[in-house]
Amino acid sequence: MELVLKDAQSALEVSETTFGRDFNEALVHQVVVAYAANARQGTRAQKTRAEVVGSGKKPWRQKGTGRARAGTVKGPIWRGGGVTFAAKAQDHSQKVNKKMYRGALKSIFSELVRQDRLIVVESFGVEAPKTKELKAKLAEMNLEDVLIVTPEIDENLFLAARNLYKVDVRDVAGIDPVSLIAFNKVLVTADAVKQIEEMLG
């Protein structure tokens, strides 16, 4: 199959398996959920009454004080006491094998092509790290909400895009399922397309 280059009167020959396969919604959903889960820290932790530092002594005698009976200062109803059902650190990570991950990326790229959301250009960059220059260049192409994918991170392009809302720059190694579906359009250079094909096999 062929992808038409937006900035040139030519087309790029690409693999049907990478850019023309059926959309596997269940697989993409599973990989996106796993990717988000793997980003979680899971380090929250609270102390139970057994873990709170403090004496085990009964604060006052059982009868005769007029106060409510109390057996510990570490109970959940006391200020500074333990938490009844204390949260503990958890590992939220989900295993996704390479075949599934690559399959999800292929599904996403194929769907982007079908929806005309994948824009392929011969090359893309800015001469200086100026937000104004990049904004004007994107406006010419009628692009606002866009992920720009290049073979390697162009520092000028990265710095120019850093202050633009809903514009991000990634190299091929830095793309992931969440970022690909988070933007309205994905702008990819021809060299990046070749790298993506090599990466996804």
From Swiss-Prot:
GO CC terms in record: ribonucleoprotein complex; ribosome
Species whose genome carries this gene: Shewanella woodyi (strain ATCC 51908 / MS32)
GO molecular function, one term: rRNA binding
Gene Ontology biological process terms from the UniProt entry: translation
Keywords annotated in UniProt: Ribonucleoprotein, Ribosomal protein, RNA-binding, rRNA-binding
Function: One of the primary rRNA binding proteins, this protein initially binds near the 5'-end of the 23S rRNA. It is important during the early stages of 50S assembly. It makes multiple contacts with different domains of the 23S rRNA in the assembled 50S subunit and ribosome. Forms part of the polypeptide exit tunnel.
Keyword Zinc-finger among record annotations: no
UniProt gene name: rplD
Name of this protein: Large ribosomal subunit protein uL4
